[in-house]
Amino acid sequence: MSFLESLPRPFFVLAPMDDVTDTVFRQIIIDCAKPDLMLTEFVNVDGLQSPGREHLLHKLKLSKKEKPVIAQLWGLKPDNFYKTTKELAGMGFEGVDLNMGCPVKTVIKNGACAALINNRGLAGEIIDATAEAAGDTLPVSVKTRVGFTTVDMSWIEFLLNKKILNMLSIHARTAKQMSKVPPDYDLLGQAVQLRNSLAPSTLIVGNGDIMNRAHGEIIAKKYDLDGVMIGRGVLHDPFAFAAASPWPEWGKDQRLGLFKKHIELFIETYKEAERKFEPLRKFCKLYINGFEDASKMRESFMHTNTVEEALKSLTA
């Protein structure tokens, strides 16, 4: 039995988001309102098993307070999934998740992530290689979508019929839809019904525009989900996992104080050459918002190019 079985029902998961859910932001979220489970940014196994490995290891940084965390992997070579999975337990991760849902064109044009929906032979090989490496040590999960260009529940059937996935996280849109149309949560209910008949032990997690805990509890109850994944919601409210968020009442000083803490932890965590400054800009609208002259301060922040300039702009 994996640790996933001991999580509350429904359990709440911080979604993997590239250049967002690094160790620094995960620690900020934990301090605000801790999710039951967290996923890393997706990291490329083919890069990790190459001479360029050192440029990717920052995505697998982990602090002692981050428990439990699952590492999310993507790539094309099953052997590299095997090798990377073998390393993960020793790094402190509690599980491995396979990205088969990212719809970004630069990723799918190479046949990875959501493109695997249309390449089930390779998808199966990747799952098998990962599961073999994980053994009884790490639970294996997949994060995906309900189809590539159109809804295709045979893809969900395929994944469930592997009989070896501990968890399946499903974004209730196709890859083609990206985030341009509302998610169809009824498809999550269909996935649960398929799970019940094909793989009763696989946990089903719903994803797609679920903004906070209250919303997630409604969706989980309606569709009998085991868990709920929140992604972009934390970029609107760092207390998204709280039963009741204090964020709407927070004023300028509190919000900027939390942003300064974020930046200072960024400085403390990464060596100068280890991670670029640019990802910090993704958090600008989260923290610099909801008070007078916020737009002017955001504009000033977006023109900064170093952490020192960024901190200075927050005190101007």
Where are these regions (language model features)?
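Conserved phosphate-coordination/catalytic loops
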Residues: 75, 117, 121, 182, ...
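Alpha/beta catalytic cores of nucleotide-metabolism and tRNA/nucleoside-modifying enzymes
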Residues: 1-8, 12, 18, 24, ...
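Alpha/beta enzyme core
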Residues: 31, 82-96, 100-110, 121-202
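Glycine-rich, positively charged N-terminal anion/phosphate-binding segment
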Residues: 2, 17-87
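Hydrophobic faces of well-ordered beta-strands that scaffold small-molecule active sites
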Residues: 12-15, 38-40, 69-73, 96, ...
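Short glycine-enriched, charge-decorated loop/helix-capping segments at active-site entrances
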Residues: 111-117, 177-178, 245-248
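Active-site beta-loop-alpha junctions enriched in small/polar residues
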Residues: 17-19, 43-45, 74-76, 101-103, ...
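An active-site metal/cofactor-coordinating segment within enzyme catalytic domains
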Residues: 53-54, 61-63, 105-116
